[in-house]
Each structure stands twice: as structure tokens, then as C-alpha cells.
Amino acid sequence: FHVVLLPILIIAVVFFHILALHEIGSNNPDGIDVKKHTDQDGVPLDAKPFFPYDITHDFYALGVFLLIFCTVIFFFPEGGGYIIEYVNYEPANPLSTPAHIVPSWYYTPFYAMLRAIDFPLFGLTAKFLGFVVMAAGIAIFAALPWLDRSPVKSIKYKGIYSKVFLAGFVISFFVLAYLGSVPPTETKNMLAKVFTFLYFAYFLLMPFYTRIEKCKPVPERVGDSV
């Protein structure tokens, strides 16, 4: 199911992203509002046309992606067992079930969250709570524009709290990805609980630490930061 659904969602997101680029315009690495400085026709002085600049930029990214993609497809299709599990090369045996079934590599962090919730709470079963936590771990990214209360957009000018929490989030994500790809044990399950908490702490505490931290001043023009 997800093999079909995920590409469709990616295509839909790309479509809406292109619509937003034509309507609002693209951002810049410094998060500077280019609409503050315009010419007599109302065109931002620091803006550039979508074509050919953004198109050329996207073609470069596409070339890098295709290089990695083709390398994996033709020379490393199993991806160390993360892309295609080695058990898929074994003859099927209806009388035997694998002791550990690993989900697709991009689901392993959320699978670790699902397994970490092994206790009931407020009359809700552990299975239901695990599903809620797993779904929330994916959906919470959509709430970032409302959670981030920082006056600046670029991590380059944000305070130390944002950088520390971001580092903790990245570490938590990769640790959960590892824990979701290996058989569960009591120790690993406890680690999954800890890093699931740190994962959500990045988002749930964001309205507070982004509001109180001290940020660096943002330049008025894009070229001022060079």
C-alpha cells in the first residue's frame, strides 16, 4: 500500500510546491524578506526569475539524485538489507515466519516509536497509543510553521537553544532508525522510549525556546551576508 501511496504523495507535494513558488516566490538561505526592497515597478531588488535560475538549480539537484539513484539500483540494490531485505532472496516457506520483520528503511524511526509504546494509558490500549504516537511523529512536521515562534527563519541567525534542540532531534531520528531496524530487547525498548521523548520534545517545546532565545540580527539585503 505505502509503495503506491508514498510516490503519489510526493508528486502531490511537488505540485503544490511549484504552485507556491509561482504565487509567493522562493526563499533564500538567510530567510530575508526580499519584498522589503523593491524597484519602481514593485519587483524585489534581490529576487531572481524562476526561469532559468531555479530551473537550473533543480536540474543540478536532479542530476545528483539520479547519480545516487542509479548507483543504488544497478550496483547496490539491497542497500545492506535496508532497501531490500535479504530474506526476500530466500525461498518462501509457509510453515516458518521470520523472527524479525523490518519495515522499509524510511519507516524505521516511526516503527521504533510504535514498539516503544508498550503500556496502556488513560484506558487506551498500548497498540492504539503506539499507532497514535507513530502517526503523530509523521504528521507533526505539518505544524512547524505554527510551532516556530522565532523572529528569524534561518538557523544561521537563531539562538543556541534552537541549535541544541535541532542537534538532539537529528540524533534521536537516527538512533530511532537504528532501533527500528533491529530485533527489540528490553534495553533497546527503553532507549526507544527515551529518544521518542527527545524527538517530540524538539517540536512540543519549540514555541517556548524559540521565543526566549537570543537571535543574531538578520541583514536587510541578501548580499549583506556575503
Mark where each language-model region is.
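Membrane-embedded and interfacial regions of multi-pass energy-transducing membrane proteins
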Residues: 1-226
